[in-house]
Amino acid sequence: MAVTTIEAGVIVEQIRMLPSGEIALELRSGATVRLDWEVWSALDLPTAVALDAEQAKALAVAEGRFRVRSKALELLANREHSSWELRQKLRQRFQDPKAIDECLVLLEERGYLSDERFAQRFLESRIANRDHGPYRLLAELQQRGISRELAESLLHEYDSPHLWLEKAERAKERILRRSKTVNPQSLWSKLHQQGFSGATISAALRDLPQPEL
């Protein structure tokens, strides 16, 4: 969405309702500004006359907020995001921290943005497709801005020794296939890096000599 310069003297020539429910303001300069109808109504700005500095500033702020929210919804349409992730991406594109914060609050209130839902989907995907242990998953969630309390609560739903042992054994077999010679100490270290507990690693390596820790 191209950035439109809105300054004192700008004139709104025409207002068009869009199929999305938004409106397009056609400016005399040839530029187009998009807003939500309720926002435009609240601004109560005149048409066909030049806006003064205060009016132009109000329109510019509203247009900036609309652009932030539009980009946020576009990103969320591609995949779930944590609040932290979405804030970081918006900060790369926009220089208005207040507009970004207001946008995130609005999206959370309307249910478009949810750290809990993001974390649930993240865990579902990781557990279905990767052989990582719970400590690795906990760290990855925290790296994405999820609180430790929420991450641990959701991971507790997968608190199954059988699940983690199965994943550790698959990870072990993959490591052994890739390396011609792997000693027990190295194998233990690699599985530890994948986020498995000592007890799970010991069970997965039960047929091998145990390393001295």
Regions found by a protein language model. Give the residues of each.
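An alpha-helical, amphipathic repeat domain used for nucleic-acid recognition
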Residues: 1-213
